[in-house]
A protein has these predicted regions:
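Generic hydrophobic transmembrane alpha-helix motif, especially the helices
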Residues: 8, 12, 18-85, 92, ...
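Transmembrane alpha-helices
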Residues: 1-12, 102-132
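Hydrophobic alpha-helical transmembrane segments of integral membrane proteins
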Residues: 38, 107, 162-163
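Residue-level preference for short helical/loop micro-motifs built around acidic side chains
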Residues: 84, 89-92, 103, 150
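Glycine-rich helix-loop "coupling/hinge" segments at transmembrane-helix boundaries
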Residues: 52-53, 82, 131-165
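Conserved small/polar residues in nucleotide/adenosyl-binding loops
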Residues: 168-173
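Hydrophobic alpha-helical segments embedded in the membrane of multi-pass proteins
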Residues: 70, 126-130, 147
Length: 173
């Protein structure tokens, strides 16, 4: 579940960052102000509020909520790398060849920023797993799904009598 939410987060953040970094100007300003607004709100609290408003938390809705609310840091780092790459000579050569903006972004710039995306994706997946465990621990996650947060909640509710579950699960998280 955390991996899928991390992949969704990475896709949204990469798309927003690529567009903001390549287009620049007013487009970049508007997108980055939206990112700033989302970053001003604590992500776990915002996730809890959105998740509690849904009628039923399923695995799909958990993935969508986590993925849709954690893309901002990825967008910022992709934008900064895209700004750097968009000023290189190969981008000017692609423009001279008549490539469209979408082709330049996805065929020329994106392959060169894959290392940044990969490094950020590792952090995003970790954050998504911790967010999902937090939601499950608080009882907001999918009740039918088995998760580390639910295991910790069960051990905690039993007064930590099941210390093996509490100890090993908390170490894994």
């Amino acid at each position: 579940m955390g991996i899928l939410a991390g992949v969704l987060t990475s896709l949204i953040g990469t798309a927003v960052g690529l567009i903001a970094g390549y287009k620049g100007g007013a487009v970049s300003e508007v997108l980055m102000r939206i990112v700033d607004v989302f970053l001003a709100i604590p992500s776990l609290a915002f996730t809890i509020v959105i998740a509690s408003m849904l009628p039923k938390m399923t695995v799909t809705s958990t993935i969508l909520v986590i993925g849709a609310l954690n893309w901002m840091w990825m967008a910022r780092s992709v934008r900064s790398q895209t700004l750097s790459e968009s000023r290189r000579d190969y981008v000017d050569a692609a423009k001279a060849l008549g490539m469209s903006d979408m082709e330049i972004m996805f065929k020329e710039i994106l392959p060169n920023i894959i290392p940044v995306i990969t490094a950020n994706m590792v952090m995003v997946i970790t954050q998504a797993m911790l967010t999902e465990a937090s939601l499950s621990f608080l009882g907001i996650g999918d009740p039918s799904a088995i998760s580390w947060g639910k295991m910790l909640s069960t051990a905690f509710d039993s007064g930590a009598i099941i210390y093996d579950c509490l100890l090993y699960t908390s170490r894994c998280v």
